[in-house]
């Protein structure tokens, strides 16, 4: 006589200790490898906004050197970590140090009688070359209080604890640089002497409109975020076109003639 066996609920298929997705449908192995979830972001599949500009991390730090003899700006050169450590011995000059429209709290470091309007880092580099001071021009670096005027200059004043040139301290050098800036005021033509990338070819320099209550210069390099030539902000001053709404045609009123009898 056949026997009836009771099946415990623990042996139900819904109480397995393994995921059903781990079962190998091909029956070649008892258990298939567990699938690892992957996160795919939509922005990873999109093309870069500016493909000609390398992403951060794909290129090392680069600097532009000024030839002390000819005064010409050499091509941008990538620097190794060893060279970068040597550059830390250089002191830094920012354009806002010489800006007459700024107070000392806003970044000015020279006396007001020596300050100038619209100072540029390229002119500061020209002054250091004229003063026979070893300098490095960094066109992309900015001061936190003057982010709209990119560019700074590294100068070597001391070597092994001794003066590297005739200027023993930074204050003395800045005084002579300020005199050079006064003799060479900034104009729109000065912007053509700054090295730019291919994105700025054909862009004519122009003064930017000043914003009331905001500290800024009217003559800044073309790659400044304040200019209309910058790829990211070139349309910031363009007023959007106002589209006039279409006139709605009113439906004619129904007129009734009342006839009295």
Swiss-Prot record:
Q: What is its main location?
A: cytoplasm
Gene Ontology CC: one annotated term: signal recognition particle, endoplasmic reticulum targeting
The record's listing under InterPro entries reads:
Signal_recog_particle_SRP19 (IPR002778), SRP19-like_sf (IPR036521)
- Keyword set, alphabetical order: Cytoplasm, Ribonucleoprotein, RNA-binding, Signal recognition particle
GO BP annotations of the record are: SRP-dependent cotranslational protein targeting to membrane, signal sequence recognition
Q: Transmembrane stretches, by residue range?
A: none
Q: Which GO terms label this protein's molecular function in UniProt?
A: 7S RNA binding
Pfam families listed in its UniProt record: SRP19
Q: Which domain of life is it from?
A: Eukaryota
What does this chain do? Signal-recognition-particle assembly has a crucial role in targeting secretory proteins to the rough endoplasmic reticulum membrane. It must be involved intimately in the translocation of a wide variety of protein substrates.
What's the subunit arrangement here? Fungal signal recognition particle consists of a 7S RNA molecule (scR1) and at least six protein subunits: SRP72, SRP68, SRP54, SEC65, SRP21 and SRP14.
- Per the similarity annotation, which family is this? Belongs to the SRP19 family.
Q: What is the protein name stated in its UniProt record?
A: Signal recognition particle SEC65 subunit
Native species of this protein? Eremothecium gossypii (strain ATCC 10895 / CBS 109.51 / FGSC 9923 / NRRL Y-1056)
């Amino acid at each position: 006589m056949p026997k009836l066996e009771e099946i415990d609920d623990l042996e139900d298929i819904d109480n397995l200790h393994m995921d059903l997705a781990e079962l190998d449908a091909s029956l070649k192995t008892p258990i298939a490898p567990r699938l690892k979830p992957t996160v795919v972001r939509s922005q990873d599949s999109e093309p870069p906004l500016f493909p000609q500009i390398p992403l951060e991390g794909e290129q090392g730090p680069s600097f532009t050197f000024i030839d002390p003899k000819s005064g010409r700006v050499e091509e941008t050169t990538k620097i190794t970590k060893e060279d970068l450590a040597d550059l830390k011995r250089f002191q830094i000059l920012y354009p806002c140090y010489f800006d007459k429209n700024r107070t000392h709290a806003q970044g000015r470091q020279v006396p007001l009688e020596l300050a100038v309007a619209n100072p540029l880092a390229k002119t500061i580099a020209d002054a250091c070359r004229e003063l026979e001071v070893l300098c490095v021009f960094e066109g992309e670096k900015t001061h936190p209080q003057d982010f709209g005027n990119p560019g700074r200059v590294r100068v070597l004043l001391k070597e092994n604890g001794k003066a590297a040139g005739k200027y023993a301290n930074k204050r003395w050098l800045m005084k002579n640089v300020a005199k050079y800036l006064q003799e060479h005021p900034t104009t729109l033509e000065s912007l053509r002497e700054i090295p730019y990338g291919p994105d700025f070819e054909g862009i004519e320099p122009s003064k930017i409109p000043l914003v009331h209550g905001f500290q800024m210069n009217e003559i800044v390099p073309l790659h400044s975020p304040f200019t209309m030539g910058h790829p990211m902000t070139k349309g910031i001053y363009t007023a959007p076109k106002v589209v006039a709404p279409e006139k709605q045609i009113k439906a004619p009123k129904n007129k009734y003639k009342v006839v009295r009898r």
